[in-house]
Each structure stands twice: as structure tokens, then as C-alpha cells.
Amino acid sequence: MKTVSVKEIYRQTEQYAGQSIRVEGWIRTLRASKAFGFIELNDGTFFKNIQIVFDEDLHNFSDVSKFTISSAIIIEGTLEITPGAKQPFEIKATNVELEAHSHKDYPLQKKRHTFEYLRQIAHLRPRSNAFSAVFRVRSIAAFAIHQFFQEKGFVYTHTPIVTGSDAEGAGEMFRVSTLDFKNIPLDEEQQVDFKKDFFGKETSLTVSGQLAAEAYALAFKKVYTFGPTFRAENSNTARHASEFWMIEPEIAFADLQDNMELAEDMLKYMIRYVMEQAPEELEFFNQFVDKGLIDRLNHVANSEFGKVTYTEAVKMLQESGEEFEYPVEWGHDLQTEHERYLTEKVFKKPVFVMDYPKDIKAFYMRMNDDNKTVAAMDLLVPGIGEIIGGSQREERLDVLTDRMKQMGLDEEEYWWYLELRKYGGVKHAGYGLGFERAIMYLTGMANIRDVISYPRTPKSAEF
């Protein structure tokens, strides 16, 4: 007898109606009386469960009636259409086998659990409705990203996780070392002698694949990375994690306008794809997590994104009459409250903020003609604020080295990056999308810890 997935049954119901089929999965709920019982079964292939009906004709009816939540079972039976019932169909069981027993102390019983509680059992939370939906959406969104770039002819590039350079110049990096902490070698100046370390130099976990991706963009024209990045930033907030995934495309022969166009196309593609492929999950989020979610996603997918310079945005905020927690001043980063005001109250749609002051942006961003601002952009979306950050990269070697000197960066450390400018270093641009923030936006989940399987945050690496 063919084993059929629950997803196949929901998607191709007519094909299996009246047929004898076999399903495998875990018990979500079970209730039984003296003569019959009902099992809600989930096999992991679909958000919804399938109902199994069993009665006293079953040879092991008494045993099945006592099966516990999360026990793994194999069902054989007939798929029956039930048009007048709560569920569209059910399986009338002819045989039920226990494959793996679940102890009675299984922590996910039939009640609503808080997200805080579920974080304490991160190894079991994918079995809950909310996290089943979150991680299926995450999978679908990841596929959408790859499909979008592959359809556009981008080369998927794998950049190093262990690096000897700081792509952001912020210094918030996790050290990678095999030195004996109890006997650390020192050099003549009594500093740590990293020449004795595994790589012969100071190394860290990457904060971004951008610099390495730029090298490949100057060979393949269009590339993207999609992988884990790490920030040793002691921010214990709902929006920050120490380990997260980044999507970082880089395009050669491109300026800031090309960059913004690509970012807009990518975000819309991802939203539309997830809405098409995960309607049940999004309906769940819309009902239980964020009641305006589907309307907001539709609005973003069908809006033409706005554009405003940083200087214009600051003026709008200062003249708004709104009382912000953080004062708005030219030369300071926009805070989340400022970003949300712009996208939710002023533009009422996603908006790109461009041309930021050079002093609040990274060394590699292209200097504008005013020598005060750089060709940088952030994409702000309603409900979250900044979701994508990017820039046109500085391709002029002399301007780039001057900027690095001003920022106190060691040119020797970036020798290979500077060399890219010597050998056909054409104008190019790119951006970064924090994947977890995208999943927060797609699902309405408010905490980054709830959209990554095993969150890594300050003082937390339990699993």
C-alpha cells in the first residue's frame, strides 16, 4: 500500500477519495469513547492535521485509545469525504500501528503555550502550530530567494565563515582561536602572539560576506551570498541575534539606483512567492499573531516603493510636530521610531532613504560629490522599519584609501580588497537583507528568537 503525505491528500483530495491509503505521522490530539475515537495526525508535510477515525472493530482498539500525544503511528485506512463536517475529509482506519511511544510528560499538551516557554524547549517547538508555520515559511522564503537570483542569472557564491578582516569596521566580532587560554603566547611587546595561533594571524567569525562577494561580482558581474553571519554585539533586544543569516547580492556595472531596483524586485518576489506557497500558514499568522498581516503584505507587494534622501527625511521628521523619544538631528542614525514614522505615517508604503552622512556609514560606501554623504540606502517597511541596507561601493582607489585612513583602518589588512580597484574595478553596488528580519515581516512574529531554529543571543547558547 502506498504511503501518502498529508500534503498530497489536501492538494489532490479527489485522486485519493475512496482509496485505501497509508499515512505516517505523530499524534497531535486523541480522544476516545467506548466505541470509537478520533486522532489528529500531523506528518510534517503540511500545516494542517488530518483526522483519523477508529472504532471498536479495530483489533487493537483498546491500545490505540490509550496512545499518548506525540507518539509516532502508521495508519492504514480509507479516505472518506465529509462535506457536512468541520473537516473536509477523514481517514477511516483499518489498521493502526505504534511506531514510537511518547512519554506522558511530553511538554506540548493541547493548550496554548507562550513563545517565552517554547524558547526553553527549542528542540520541541517545531511541533507546535506556530513554529511549524514559522519554519515552513522560512524554508519557502529561502527557496524563493535562491529562485529569484537564479532566474536573473546570479552566481551563488560561498564566502568564508572564518575571516581575517572586519567587513563593517565596527570591531564587534567573535574571535576564532585554538590558543591555550591557560598559557597564551606573548610577543616581544607582551601582546598576544597570534602568529602562534592556528591560522598564524588574528581571525574571527564573519560579520558579512560582502567584501569577498565584491571580488566575485568583479568576475561574474552578478553574484549573491546566503549564509550565516555573526555579531558580538551585546544587544539583548527583540530585533538582534548574535548569529543570523544574510542575503548579500553584489552587482557590477551598477549604481545606487540599480541597487534599489534589485532590492525592491527581490522583496516583492519573496512576498508573492510565500503568499502563493504558504496560504494556510499566513492565514494562521493573520488570525493569531498579527491581524493586519495579509493586508500589509499585499500592500507591499503591490506598492511602488518611495524614495527620499536622508537630508529630506530628517527635515520631514523635524517638521512633523511628532514627539520622538530620540531627537532627530542631521548626522545621527535614524532610530526605529523615526523609520516607522516615515514609512507608516508620511509615505504609507515602503520607502528607500538614500545618501546618508559619511560619518555614520561604513568605509566602503561611495562618496557623493558633496563630500558629506555617501551613496547608501536603507529600505524601510511598515511595521518594522529598516529591513535592507546597502550602497554603491567606492571603486576609486584613492578615495577609498583616504577614507580608510580617516577611519583608522589598516590598509595592509585589506590589501586584497584594495587590489580589486587596480584591476578593472568598475562601479558596483550591493545590499544586505537580514533573513530573520524578513521572516519576522512575513509572519508578524515580534521576536527574532522565534524565527531562527536555535537562537544565539548574549548569555544564551543552550541548544
Curated annotation (Swiss-Prot):
Q: Where, subcellularly, is it found?
A: Cytoplasm
- The protein's superkingdom reads Bacteria
One GO molecular function term of this record is:
ATP binding
Query: Which PROSITE patterns does the record associate with it?
Result: AA_TRNA_LIGASE_II
Catalytic activity, EC: 6.1.1.22
User: Which GO annotations describe the biological process of this protein?
Assistant: asparaginyl-tRNA aminoacylation
Q: What is a single cellular component term in the Gene Ontology annotation? A: cytoplasm
Entry keyword set: Aminoacyl-tRNA synthetase, ATP-binding, Cytoplasm, Ligase, Nucleotide-binding, Protein biosynthesis
Cross-referenced CDD domains:
AsxRS_core (cd00776), EcAsnRS_like_N (cd04318)
Q: Does the keyword Transmembrane helix apply?
A: no
- Reactions mediated catalytically: tRNA(Asn) + L-asparagine + ATP = L-asparaginyl-tRNA(Asn) + AMP + diphosphate + H(+)
List, alphabetically, the SUPFAM superfamilies matched: Class II aaRS and biotin synthetases, Nucleic acid-binding proteins
Give the primary localization class: cytoplasm
Q: What class of enzyme is it?
A: ligase
Query: Among its keywords, does the record have Iron?
Result: no
Would you identify the family this protein belongs to, as annotated?
Answer: Belongs to the class-II aminoacyl-tRNA synthetase family.
Q: HAMAP family this protein is in? A: Asn_tRNA_synth (MF_00534)
Q: How does it assemble?
A: Homodimer.
Q: What is this protein called?
A: Asparagine--tRNA ligase
